[in-house]
């Protein structure tokens, strides 16, 4: 994945970056409810999870700061595009990681996502493929309606955004 090094000394958020970087637990999270009525209609017979994943990853990539990662040498890189790495559940209830690389049209993304899921469900593991630092880590817990999930982070320098959602509900 291609990225550009950001000069944090000249970045308008330099102070905030330094402040949070010095913390032992520098992570912040936000929980929002999203109306997916239009998406449910527009997706037709296409898979719900991959349709929502496509929309979420497009939205996250539209925010440059969400594409920024801290490199091992402490520099900050802004990726041109960040793909999702998400969990897929095998028939035995064990989950594995699946990745769909690249910025692509909706129909292509759905087909590629289905292909990759078949592949990882046959032989997948908890090992990530590709440039792990570029990923958005995505989890879905579709049998539980929840308002927050706090996924684990490897270290304080782990700067991959985590995105999750639970069971969707109908609200009148």
Which positions does each model-derived feature cover?
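Short, solvent-exposed polar/charged micro-motifs at secondary-structure junctions
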Residues: 40-41, 77-81, 146-150
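Flexible, Gly/Pro-enriched loop and linker segments at secondary-structure and domain junctions
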Residues: 1-33, 49, 135-139, 144-172
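Acyl-group handling in specialized metabolite and lipid biosynthesis
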Residues: 28-44, 95-108
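A short, structural micro-pattern
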Residues: 78-80, 130-132, 157-159
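Acyl activation and transfer enzymes in specialized metabolism, enriched
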Residues: 40-64, 172
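Small-residue-rich loop/turn and linker elements
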Residues: 66-99, 128
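Long, contiguous hydrophobic alpha-helical segments, chiefly transmembrane helices and signal peptides
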Residues: 30-32, 53, 60, 66, ...
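Helical lid/core segments from catalytic subdomains that handle acyl or acyl-like groups
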Residues: 90-148
